[in-house]
UniProtKB/Swiss-Prot annotation:
The keyword Endoplasmic reticulum does not apply. It is found in: Cell inner membrane. PANTHER family: UPF0060 MEMBRANE PROTEIN YNFA. It is a multi-pass membrane protein. It comes from the Bacteria. Belongs to the UPF0060 family. Keywords: Cell inner membrane, Cell membrane, Membrane, Transmembrane, Transmembrane helix. This is UPF0060 membrane protein Mfla_2554. One of its GO terms (cellular component) is plasma membrane. InterPro entries: UPF0060. The chain crosses the membrane at residues 7-27, 33-53, 61-81, 83-103. The lineage of its organism: Bacteria, Pseudomonadati, Pseudomonadota, Betaproteobacteria, Nitrosomonadales.
Length: 110
């Protein structure tokens, strides 16, 4: 159960970060409303707060979180940007998730 909660927290954190960066992108590159900066700032603040909830040493959390971020970003590419990821994208995201699992869930003496 710990593992499921950890991965779910990583996914929610990644979504908060991606949304917080995607909304300013829409404003800057697609001429959307500057009001998008308000939910973007809220989303990035949520992202920073969520990072404090992760149950391990900060460096380990950031390294493992990177693997989940890669997976969520590829999923975002597919669902939001409507671009079908390549097999290489899926392979890379799978390798990143494997790395995350090793970093977060490997047995440790301390």
């Amino acid at each position: 159960m710990f593992e499921l909660k950890t991965v779910a927290l990583f996914v929610i954190t990644a979504l908060a970060e991606i949304i917080g960066c995607y909304l300013p992108y829409l404003w800057l590159n697609q001429n959307k409303s500057p009001l998008l900066l308000i939910p973007a700032a809220i989303s990035l603040a949520l992202f920073a707060w969520l990072l404090t909830l992760h149950p391990s040493a900060a460096g380990r959390v950031y390294a493992a979180y990177g693997g989940v971020y890669i997976f969520v970003a590829i999923f975002w590419l597919w669902v939001v940007d409507d671009i079908i990821p390549s097999n290489w994208d899926f392979l890379g995201a799978s390798v990143a998730l494997l790395g995350m699992a090793i970093i977060m869930f490997a047995p440790r003496s301390t």
